[in-house]
Each structure stands twice: as C-alpha cells, then as structure tokens.
Amino acid sequence: GLSHSGMHTLGKALFGAEEILSGSVHANGKNIKHTKDAIKAGVGYTSKDRDYESLCLQSPIIDNITSTGYEKNRAFGPFISRKKEAEYCQEQIDKLQLKCASMYHLVSTLSGGNKQKVVFGKWLAADSKILILDCPTRGIDVGVKANMYKMIYDMKKAGKAIVFISEELPELVGMSDRILILKDGKVSLEIARKEGFSEHKLIEYMI
C-alpha cells in the first residue's frame, strides 16, 4: 500500500506493539496482546525505522543480537553465560556474513545493510518462526539489496513464515506468494501468485 495506508500500523499490531481496538491476533495457538506474547509465540519484527525501534545504536552488536536470547544463554538461575552469549552472537555474524571488526563494536558504527543484518540476527538466533519485515530494504544501497533478498528467500526455504511489508511494488511482485493491498486501513485486494501479479492492477487498488 501507500505510506499512509495503515500497513506499518498493521505490522506493529501483529507484533503486539500497537493497541488493537477490535479483533485479535493469534500465532502458534497464542493470543498476541503484547510484544512479549509475540516473542514467546515465535514472532519477530523488524521496524521500518530500525535505528529507533529495532536497534540500540549505542550498544555493542553482541548486546543487540542476544537481546532476545535470554533463555538460551543462561548459566544458572538468573545469570547469563558470557561464553554462551559470545558463541550465540558469533554464529549469527558468520551465518549472515555481517561485516564488523568485533562483536563488541557499537551498532552505530555499522552500514545500513549490516545494521539490518543485526536485526535479522537477533530474531533468527531466537529461532522465530514468523518474521514481520517492515520495509527491510529501506535505506540500503542497490548492491546490498540483492543480498537481503537472498537472505529473506533462505529464511522462507528454512520454513519461516514471512510477512513482507513494502511500498515498492517490484520487490513485492518478485518476492511474494500472496499480496494484500491496503487502502485507507482496509484490505482492498488479496491475490495469489498463481492468479498472476500485475503491477498495473496492484496500483489500481492502492490509489
């Protein structure tokens, strides 16, 4: 949809970050009323405003990636194992080919593409089954976008369910199995790939 169609608000609502006035959201048998419910249900969310809503810029890479992995990195009781955290973080750095001198460097020092990899890393490390990606390629140069698309495709092949929110029709047409168009907060069109995606038709339902 267009930028004010309600798609960004919908993404937040699916993750429990936006109050729902009517209806409900369920994932893996759990009712999502808050972000903590979503995380427990295996739902991850990347915001279009990643610097402000998905990352702690003045914290190191390791703190960002391990922020969703408390249970996996516990030593005993409430205590965290620093060794487990470092291994947990390094696994994502290697898997996502994140370019950084050290996992202890601040996220603010990274390029846009590598910042987005940190966001992906924290949800993949948490083994999220459903990923809500709101404009994941925004602010990323063309060369890095192709790498991002491959990462998203690999997530899909690994069995993740992807909710891809975007204002860019070419990437939606190229990546989606099914497209929902939002206009004025309502679904104006739902169409599957097998029915044929036409950019002209999609635009018609957007404006």
Give each language-model segment a name.
Residues 1-207:
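Glycine-rich phosphate-binding loops of nucleotide-dependent enzymes
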